[in-house]
Amino acid sequence: MRKNALLLALLAAGPLFGPYTVAAQTPTADQAPLTLTQITQMAFQVSPTLTAAQQSVVQAQARVGQAQAQRRFQITFNSTASLSGANVYQPPPTYETFGTLQNTLTVPLPLGKRPRLAITQAQELRGAVSAQLDSARLALAGQAAAAYYDVLRKQALLAVAQQTLIENQRALSDVQKRNGAGDAAQLDVLQAQVPVAAAQAALGGAENDLAIANETLNSLLGRPLDSSLLLADIAPNALALPYTLSQAKQFVLERSPDLRSAEATIRADRAAVDAARLYREPAYFLQAIDIRSKDVTSFRSEDTLQAAVTLPLSDGGLGKAQVQEAEATLAGASAQAEVVRRTIISGVSAAYLTAQSRRRQVDSARTARDIAQVTYDKTTLGYRNGLFPLFQVLTARAALTQARIAYTQAVYDAAAASTTLSTAFAGSMPTPAPAPAVPAPAPLAGTIGTSPAGTGPSRASSGGRGGP
């Protein structure tokens, strides 16, 4: 039993005697904590992915302008100068050399359905690209939120590790004093040294985890990887879900940019099919021709106004092949839209259930932490009164440490899950204000005061947070 208790003590954290707290770092006036909204806006400003998506929208708009230009009158001027030699039927002269200048104005007439279908196709593709830009924004917002909450989570866990080490060192010192006074055995001193060593190892891991999380967030913001950030912490309560699962599915189908992009692509491909089927549509031109010649046997100048019609008679099967290609593209776009629809439904369902589960986990973890605190307090009092051996105190402390870590994880997991659900809702889900943190009850006699990390995080910075 003592062996098991020693193994559990490797994760033990929490004080043995006397009140002790570590205050959270207070930001200075010129270092206002950055909120998630501010972090997201900063990511938007420097993201190359978002810049590329924005340029795609500009390109799509330019293609719309090109298609619309095909519906306007376009005038082409052509001038041809030539030098000719000819035998004359009725001399004199029997042979002559003369020059000719021909000026031609050609005006294609924007008649038929194909120019209008080209405009429709370009406009729908512009809508698809615009929806893809919205999707890129949401994806980037999701990445920013994940990195933001990961930094907060790692800061909170680092604070737990720091406080754990301090409290275990304090506990070891107290046991050593009791051993010197003859109130504790030497084995108790050895047992108290185990959680100190474990806490030192855990602190190194927590510092490394926070450094990696900071680098990830800084990379997303285009900042130096080792720069520090001061982040505004969250309330220790998950956000309420304002919709049922069925309502969530319906809402996301109406607002999803990925589905809007897929549907716009279908409409564009349908216009392309209609245009391809008009491969025999004639083309109309209007021409004004002015000819000036030095031919003495013919006219000196000639002005002509003519209308021309170009009608494809045979293209070797090119038109039919283009129709088949357009129809296959349309069928593929329709299938892809169904894939997107199913992915969206499954994604929002998973996000909704996860957010709901995370919220319940926060409540359960809070209850478990409170019970572990009471158990530890009573075990500590029993140890001080000689009723329990030290290994039972270490076991209770290990359970309390695990409960604190689980609660800290649950708080940030719930916040991240709510943000993920909001992203699945195309960022438009109404979000009720979080409930304020409930103050923790006063600590029992002989226990430490409850710090912010013990009741739920309230503020975080790159320099650390309050202890557990």
Predicted regions mapped to residue ranges:
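Terminal intrinsically disordered/low-complexity segments used for targeting and assembly
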Residues: 1-45, 207-251, 420-468
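Small/polar, glycine/serine/threonine/aspartate-rich low-complexity segments that form flexible
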Residues: 26-32, 76-114, 118, 230-245, ...
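Acidic, glycine-rich loop-and-beta core segments that form the ion-binding/anion-interacting portion
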Residues: 239, 245-288
